UniProtKB/Swiss-Prot annotation:
Residues 416-466 form the FBD domain. It comes from the Eukaryota. It comes from Arabidopsis thaliana (Mouse-ear cress). Keywords: Leucine-rich repeat, Repeat. This is Putative F-box/FBD/LRR-repeat protein At4g03220.
Length: 498
């Protein structure tokens, strides 16, 4: 039989246990911590939590970040609509402490609904707006965005048809706080020359600009004093590009200048540029660097040419490469090497030396007519440490099987390389790592590999990565023994096969 003392202790323990169960410790946390908890959940789960109590409803309606992309799907438009977003925004309080930091959504929408959503977001002083919309017609750039005094970052993308930019006169004086801007599928047939749109009066604080799929754009000038990153992609009709900015550090232009205009031009005035990416663009008629790119660290050039006015295109490519002569790292695409290998290429032009170059990557077919070009490029890189050669395999390439007896032929490629040893002395004294991709044990790549092994005094490692077409293990073993059989200039050199 329990005593009164034992009963009291037992009852006290039960009351303490019930108290722990009844107390909602999470709800009593500060709003900032509860917001962090809700932000870790998908928005749909956070909305469901708001049904628990008035406290959680208030927390949900005061979330600083709303990401509706986690609950909607453009491929299934019936699963979500702009009305749902509008209702959530409408229920929010307009207190200063309840401002909207960021809003993201992907939704099919009419222009009227889109304008209402953006107006409501601007009313809540949104700072970061990231939206992608599907519409049944072209639409105009929402004017509420232009006049917002709180917007810091904007991403506007049309998933199908596109939108029109406001006139330059309307943009001037707007976007005063914007630091990041990304626009995709812009319709510019009525204003093909944007020479005074992306300038300081309209974008005094802009640091990052991304433009993609600008239809009808022919000439573009970007001149914002605080701009640090600029990317332009898929503007096929572009004929002229002018970029200037003392703080610009990264410039990326991809898939542009497809109009084949005889007056196409590029002007670059970015003295502090560190990264230059020029990918899949047609060679322009002229290139002008108004300042030396002495801060350049990385450059990538992949171009293609059209069969009109070849002389100006070749000269344009040389001007482009010469403007990149201060780069630490350079990657050249296959067409760039082919243009340099043309009859009017390197034989009649001279590249400025790349004294700062430490890393060089070349994409090439490695045909016989490429050999002199490679030699000239190596001469232009006297301090190079790392060389990567990616061999492009196609049906038109001359790929003769390697035969060790070719060493004795006076007209073989290896003899040409041997004749270049003196002029390549500095290059050979600094080269440490070589990697050849697409190695199929043909004469072209074997001649290059043997030459670098025989004369590379600083060589540490040569990596040969075979093409998937070459999996003959017996032949690979024979090639390995032949390569190691030649006397190497460096006692540290090792050969790795993959």
């Amino acid at each position: 039989m329990e005593t009164r003392s034992v009963k009291r202790k037992k009852k006290k323990k039960e009351e303490e246990a019930n108290w722990f169960i009844r107390v909602d410790r999470i709800s009593n946390l500060p709003d900032s911590l509860n917001h962090q908890i809700l932000l870790l959940l998908p928005l749909k789960s956070a909305a469901q939590a708001s049904l628990l109590s008035k406290r959680w409803r208030s927390l949900f309606l005061s979330l600083p970040d709303l990401d509706f992309t986690s609950i909607n799907d453009l491929k299934n438009p019936k699963s979500f609509s702009s009305n749902s977003i509008y209702k959530v925004l409408s229920l929010r309080s307009h207190r200063d402490s309840n401002n909207l930091r960021s809003l993201r959504f992907r939704v099919p929408v009419t222009f009227t609904s889109l304008n209402s959503l953006i107006r409501l977001a601007v009313t809540h002083q949104v700072q970061d707006l990231d939206i992608e919309v599907t519409t049944k017609d072209y639409f105009n750039f929402p004017r509420w965005i232009v006049t917002s005094q709180n917007l810091r970052a904007l991403t506007l993308k049309s998933a199908n048809l596109g939108f029109r930019l406001p006139p330059s006169s309307s943009a001037r004086g707007g976007f005063q706080k914007l630091t990041s801007l990304s626009l995709s599928r812009v319709i510019l047939h009525n204003q093909p020359c944007l020479s005074d749109f992306f300038t300081d009066p309209s974008f005094p604080l802009l640091e990052k600009l991304t433009l993609e799929c600008c239809f009808g754009l022919k000439e573009l000038k970007v001149s914002c004093r605080l701009l640090q990153e600029f990317s332009l992609k898929n503007s096929l009709q572009l004929e002229g590009l002018e970029v200037s900015g003392n703080k610009l550090q990264k410039l990326k232009v991809e898939s542009c200048f497809y109009s084949y205009s005889e007056k196409s031009f590029v002007k670059i005035n970015t003295p502090n540029l560190k990264t230059f990416l020029w990918n899949s663009n047609a060679v322009t008629t002229s290139v002008h660097f108004l300042d030396k790119l002495v801060c350049l660290r990385k450059a990538f050039v992949k171009v293609f040419w059209h069969h009109q006015d070849l002389n100006s295109q070749i000269q344009s490519l040389f001007t482009l490469l010469s403007g990149l002569c201060h780069s630490y790292k350079l990657q050249l695409g296959n067409q760039s090497v082919e243009i340099l290998s043309s009859k009017k290429g390197l034989l009649k032009n001279h590249l400025l030396p790349f004294h700062n170059m430490r890393f060089l990557e070349l994409q090439t077919r490695l045909n016989r007519h490429n050999v002199q070009t490679l030699s000239c490029l190596f001469k232009s890189c006297p301090m190079l440490n790392i060389l990567t050669v990616k061999i492009i395999d196609d049906q038109t390439s001359e790929r003769r099987q390697w035969n060790k007896d070719l060493w004795d032929m006076s007209n073989s490629e290896i003899q040409y390389w041997e004749s270049q040893a003196y002029e390549l002395e500095s290059f050979l004294n600094h080269l440490e790592f070589v990697e050849i991709h697409g190695f199929v044990e043909c004469e072209n790549e074997m001649s290059l590999a043997i030459f670098l092994l025989r004369h590379g005094k600083a060589l540490i490692k040569m990596t040969l990565r075979s093409s998937f077409l070459c999996r003959d293990s017996l032949r690979r073993q024979m090639i390995r023994s032949q390569l190691t059989g030649f006397s190497m200039a460096s006692s540290k050199a090792k050969i790795s096969f993959h």
